[in-house]
Curated annotation (Swiss-Prot):
Keywords: Mitochondrion, Ribonucleoprotein, Ribosomal protein, Transit peptide
Protein name: Large ribosomal subunit protein mL51
Coiled coil segments of this chain: none
Originating gene: mrpl51
Highest taxon listed in the record's lineage: Eukaryota
Length: 125
């Protein structure tokens, strides 16, 4: 029994290489480096630099102001979400009478196009 184990132990590398009919790409898997190389990322890009910028509003302002009230942008878009058609309709309702003629016509054209598009294609039908 001991001699059989010694034979198998001594010829282990021959047995394992002899029974494989395909290559693993490397002779010894223990020598391979499995640690990935670290990514070179910019830690101060725009997204990371402004992360949590409005977190102190509640602490310093006694929780009276919501961050959406501090965001500067068009009045018809503040604190509101929606697709392009809904956004254009909302803009026409809020500032349509005060728009220049050409801008209002271009907005109406865009609304007509999007209305047809949303009713013909996509999951909105």
């Amino acid at each position: 029994m001991w001699s059989v184990q010694q034979l198998l132990w001594g010829c282990r590398s021959l047995l394992t290489q002899g029974c494989r009919s395909f290559s693993l790409g490397s002779r010894d898997l223990r020598k391979m480096n499995f640690m990935p190389q670290p990514k070179n990322t910019d830690r101060w890009d725009h997204k990371r630099a402004l992360y949590g910028v409005y977190d102190n509003i509640g602490i310093l302002g006694d929780f009276k102001a919501h961050p959406r009230d501090l965001i500067i942008g068009p009045s018809w878009l503040r604190g509101w979400k929606g697709n392009e058609l809904q956004r254009c309709i909302r803009k026409r309702q809020m500032v349509g009478p005060r728009m220049f003629y050409e801008d209002r016509e271009n907005l109406n054209k865009r609304i007509r196009f999007l209305y047809k598009r949303f009713n013909r294609y996509g999951k909105h039908r």
